[in-house]
Amino acid sequence: MTQTIFVLNGPNLNMLGKREPGIYGGKTLKDIEADCKAAGRELGLDIDFRQSNHEGTLVDWFHEADEKAVGVAINAGAYTHTSVALHDAIRAISIPVVELHISNVHAREEFRHKSMIAPACKGVICGFGPHSYILALHALKNITA
């Protein structure tokens, strides 16, 4: 049976490819989804890839993932730095969560240096461009095997 990984994306990630390409690169979220699904096939994983600009929807998806998946990769966007709700949703589920970011958030503005969700996650990957998603999938495959 193929294991499922949820890949969740937060606010403004639907704007990838248009939004600050000097920071985030030229790939769209659809491009990243295709890359994740291809990597998933190579790893024997089923990838459930989603994006929402709404915090409550992301919380609901964490709850759903706990029933349907073996792990979650999350690029929470700006919610990384503000969301106690996402922190609590991650703590509430029994499967591992990996936080990821396209850019190196620690080399950017001071307000991006603190993650509200990192303490609830198994690990954090950032700064490798869109490849951060693939690294997160490899990490989840390794810790759920």
From Swiss-Prot:
<dbReference type="GO" id="GO:0009073">
    <property type="term" value="P:aromatic amino acid family biosynthetic process"/>
</dbReference>
<feature type="binding site">
    <location>
        <position position="112"/>
    </location>
    <ligand>
        <name>substrate</name>
    </ligand>
</feature>
<dbReference type="Pfam" id="PF01220">
    <property type="entry name" value="DHquinase_II"/>
</dbReference>
<comment type="subunit">
    <text>Homododecamer.</text>
</comment>
<dbReference type="GO" id="GO:0019631">
    <property type="term" value="P:quinate catabolic process"/>
</dbReference>
<dbReference type="GO" id="GO:0008652">
    <property type="term" value="P:amino acid biosynthetic process"/>
</dbReference>
<feature type="site" description="Transition state stabilizer">
    <location>
        <position position="19"/>
    </location>
</feature>
<dbReference type="InterPro" id="IPR001874">
    <property type="entry name" value="DHquinase_II"/>
</dbReference>
<feature type="active site" description="Proton acceptor">
    <location>
        <position position="24"/>
    </location>
</feature>
<feature type="binding site">
    <location>
        <position position="75"/>
    </location>
    <ligand>
        <name>substrate</name>
    </ligand>
</feature>
<dbReference type="GO" id="GO:0009423">
    <property type="term" value="P:chorismate biosynthetic process"/>
</dbReference>
<keyword id="KW-0057">Aromatic amino acid biosynthesis</keyword>
<protein>
    <recommendedName>
        <fullName>3-dehydroquinate dehydratase</fullName>
        <ecNumber>4.2.1.10</ecNumber>
    </recommendedName>
</protein>
<feature type="binding site">
    <location>
        <position position="88"/>
    </location>
    <ligand>
        <name>substrate</name>
    </ligand>
</feature>
<dbReference type="InterPro" id="IPR036441">
    <property type="entry name" value="DHquinase_II_sf"/>
</dbReference>
<keyword id="KW-0456">Lyase</keyword>
<comment type="similarity">
    <text>Belongs to the type-II 3-dehydroquinase family.</text>
</comment>
<feature type="binding site">
    <location>
        <begin position="102"/>
        <end position="103"/>
    </location>
    <ligand>
        <name>substrate</name>
    </ligand>
</feature>
<dbReference type="InterPro" id="IPR018509">
    <property type="entry name" value="DHquinase_II_CS"/>
</dbReference>
<keyword id="KW-0028">Amino-acid biosynthesis</keyword>
<dbReference type="GO" id="GO:0003855">
    <property type="term" value="F:3-dehydroquinate dehydratase activity"/>
</dbReference>
<comment type="function">
    <text>Catalyzes a trans-dehydration via an enolate intermediate.</text>
</comment>
<comment type="pathway">
    <text>Metabolic intermediate biosynthesis; chorismate biosynthesis; chorismate from D-erythrose 4-phosphate and phosphoenolpyruvate: step 3/7.</text>
</comment>
<feature type="active site" description="Proton donor">
    <location>
        <position position="101"/>
    </location>
</feature>
<feature type="binding site">
    <location>
        <position position="81"/>
    </location>
    <ligand>
        <name>substrate</name>
    </ligand>
</feature>
